[in-house]
């Protein structure tokens, strides 16, 4: 018995000497229609505060149904300037933050026109080229495309890739991409799903208006009051008084760029929140659930093939004040006290 204990101790000590290898960060490229309403600017502040948690491959200004022309790369750069002022403070708390210069180098503007009218021969943009350059890196990790507005910059990138590459090369490119889009904010998302059925795509399909947003999983971030689709659990954490006290006022130049909410707080944040390595493993499969919500892969109505989306099987049930609440939004709001 004594020798067995000694053997166990030696094995434990040997294991302790093995170098610890940190988990690889997820790669992410953001497409944002910043300026049309406050929540994109709110989400960008959070994205930058967590910039040490992933490898940022691009920050691309785009159009959407709410911003049909003049993508605002200048607003991205304004937030990056503020990030540069606070980075020294951020690195006191955690390592891995990119420099302001590194982030400025991957900022770009996508398609200047709304939807599929901006996609076609000779319409490539700095944003679509940045996306392809990131995807073409000799890196085995997937490239997450976090779409906060319209999807036509991704559509242009894949339009160009299909025209210029062999079917085998295109297949390899598609296999590297993982898309999470905040509903359908132009007609390019539908086109992408029709033309590239193998593309990994998370979406709560919708018209290009807001009429179906109340059903979308992503509204669980803070949409309880505006969309009337949640029991307001810990809602004070996502409302203006808390945001002003804990982010906006007296929290430095980056916090000062966080606007008061007008509709919901950070509606675009679910598209990247699950990429933070918090132990829930969401990036491995959206079916696991986590800060980015829970999704299932199936062929919903009007889709031509399975996508990652909402269904009766992606809902969580939680008890609130003695009552059961079941919804897809619950897969996000259940974590509200943790992500705030």
How should these model regions be labeled?
Residues 1-10:
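Bacterial N-terminal signal peptides that target proteins for export
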Residues 15-16:
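Hydrophobic alpha-helical transmembrane segments of integral membrane proteins
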Residues 23-340:
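N-terminal acidic, glycine/proline-rich low-complexity segments
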């Amino acid at each position: 018995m004594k020798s067995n204990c000694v053997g166990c101790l030696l094995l434990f000590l040997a294991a302790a000497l093995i170098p610890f290898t940190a988990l690889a960060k997820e790669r992410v490229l953001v497409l944002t229609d910043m300026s049309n309403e406050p929540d994109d600017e709110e989400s960008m502040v959070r994205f930058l505060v967590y910039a040490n948690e992933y490898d940022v491959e691009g920050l691309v200004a785009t159009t959407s149904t709410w911003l049909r022309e003049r993508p605002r790369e200048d607003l991205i750069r304004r937030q990056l300037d503020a990030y540069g002022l606070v980075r020294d403070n951020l690195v006191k708390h955690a390592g891995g933050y990119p420099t302001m210069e590194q982030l400025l180098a991957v900022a770009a503007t996508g398609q200047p026109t709304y939807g599929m009218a901006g996609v076609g021969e000779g319409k490539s943009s700095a944003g679509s080229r940045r996306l392809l350059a990131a995807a073409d890196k000799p890196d085995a990790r997937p490239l997450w495309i976090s779409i906060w507005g319209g999807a036509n910059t991704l559509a242009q990138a894949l339009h160009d890739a299909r025209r210029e590459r062999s079917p085998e090369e295109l297949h390899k490119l598609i296999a590297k991409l993982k898309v999470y889009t905040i509903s359908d904010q132009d007609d390019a998302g539908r086109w992408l799903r029709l033309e590239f059925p193998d593309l990994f795509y998370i979406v709560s399909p919708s018209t290009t208006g807001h009429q179906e947003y109340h059903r979308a999983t992503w509204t669980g971030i803070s949409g309880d009051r505006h969309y009337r689709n949640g029991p307001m659990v810990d809602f004070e954490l996502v409302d203006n008084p808390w945001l002003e006290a804990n982010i906006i006022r007296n929290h430095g130049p980056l916090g000062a760029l966080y606007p008061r909410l007008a509709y919901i707080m950070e509606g675009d944040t679910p598209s990247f929140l699950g990429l933070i390595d918090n132990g829930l493993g969401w990036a491995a499969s959206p079916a696991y659930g986590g800060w980015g919500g829970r999704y299932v892969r199936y062929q919903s109505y009007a889709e031509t093939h399975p996508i990652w989306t909402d269904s009766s099987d992606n809902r969580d049930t939680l008890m609130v004040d003695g009552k059961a609440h079941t919804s897809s939004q619950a897969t996000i709001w259940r974590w509200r006290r943790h992500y705030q």
